[in-house]
Swiss-Prot record:
Organism this protein belongs to: Fomes meliae
Top-level lineage group: Eukaryota
Molecular function terms from GO: cellulase activity
Role summary: Endoglucanase (EG) that cleaves the internal beta-1,4-glucosidic bonds in cellulose.
Protein name: Endoglucanase gh5
Temperature dependence: Optimum temperature is 70 degrees Celsius. Thermostable. Highly stable at 50, 60 and 70 degrees Celsius.
């Protein structure tokens, strides 16, 4: 979860794309 929170500080577009990959990795 800490990684996801840090990702929120990035750009919106990049954040969403990175978040999607991160969530997929978590699952």
């Amino acid at each position: 979860q800490a990684v996801l929170s840090e990702t929120g500080g990035g750009d919106t577009a990049s954040c969403d794309e990175y978040l999607y990959q991160e969530l997929a990795y978590v699952k």
